[in-house]
């Protein structure tokens, strides 16, 4: 399947979303190629519970891209990335960002390798590993973990990967007062950004946590 096999309204929804997020319309083509590949592999390998490509545009692509204004360059580790979310959309739209996609599930890691090859995405790589087992201490400027755990839980498994002064960018729903209060010593909240995701109802926040 290529992007041409996706219904026209899928492409239109993505283009509207990119415009709402002030992103170049040229990113639609590689994002649709990634989406088409995900739809095809998902039928066999069950990479995501979301099946409808229209819903994938909102819940996977546009939701992932909501954080991109707050991360421009440097090295990013995306922990428990699944099929590459948010790491692959971020790598597409932020070519100066070096993205490591950390995922222990073999079929998801295989999918991501194929996606990177298919997209010729040279600024991303796959690390087939659990985050806590990845032996790359202080190698990253940024961490993100869209689908993992509490803030303290993310720090427990992946905090060693972040350099001093680096930032954890955590996507959350409602403002996570309790999680912020439970941060371990040496970690502080820098900013909390309310996010608007085109087509997605409900609260979304990006919590930026700094490593002391």
Swiss-Prot record:
Gene3D superfamilies: Vaccinia Virus protein VP39. GO terms for cellular component: cytosol. It catalyses: guanosine(527) in 16S rRNA + S-adenosyl-L-methionine = N(7)-methylguanosine(527) in 16S rRNA + S-adenosyl-L-homocysteine. Pfam families: GidB. Keywords: Cytoplasm, Methyltransferase, rRNA processing, S-adenosyl-L-methionine, Transferase. Coiled coil: none annotated. One of its GO terms (molecular function) is rRNA (guanine-N7-)-methyltransferase activity. InterPro entries: rRNA_ssu_MeTfrase_G, SAM-dependent_MTases_sf. HAMAP family: 16SrRNA_methyltr_G. PANTHER family: S-ADENOSYL-L-METHIONINE-DEPENDENT METHYLTRANSFERASES SUPERFAMILY PROTEIN (PTHR31760:SF0). Specifically methylates the N7 position of guanine in position 527 of 16S rRNA. This is Ribosomal RNA small subunit methyltransferase G. It comes from Xanthomonas axonopodis pv. citri (strain 306).
């Amino acid at each position: 399947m290529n992007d041409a096999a996706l219904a026209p309204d899928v492409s239109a929804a993505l283009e509207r979303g990119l415009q709402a997020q002030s992103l170049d319309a040229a990113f639609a083509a590689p994002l649709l190629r990634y989406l088409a590949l995900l739809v095809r592999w998902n039928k066999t390998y069950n990479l995501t519970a979301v099946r409808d490509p229209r819903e994938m545009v909102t819940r996977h692509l546009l939701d992932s891209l909501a954080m991109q204004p707050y991360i421009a360059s440097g090295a990013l580790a995306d922990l428990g990335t699944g099929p590459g979310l948010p790491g692959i959309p971020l790598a597409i739209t932020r070519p100066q960002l070096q993205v490591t996609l950390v995922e222990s599930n073999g079929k998801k890691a295989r999918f991501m390798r194929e996606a990177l090859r298919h997209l010729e995405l040279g600024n991303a790589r796959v690390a087939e590993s659990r985050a806590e087992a990845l032996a790359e201490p202080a190698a990253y400027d940024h961490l993100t973990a869209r689908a993992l755990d509490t803030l303290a839980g993310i720090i427990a498994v992946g905090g060693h990967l972040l350099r001093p002064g680096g930032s954890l960018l955590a996507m959350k729903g409602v403002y996570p007062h309790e999680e912020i209060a439970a941060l371990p010593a040496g970690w502080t909240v820098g900013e909390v950004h309310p996010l608007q995701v085109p087509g997605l109802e409900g609260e979304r926040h990006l919590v930026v946590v700094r490593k002391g």
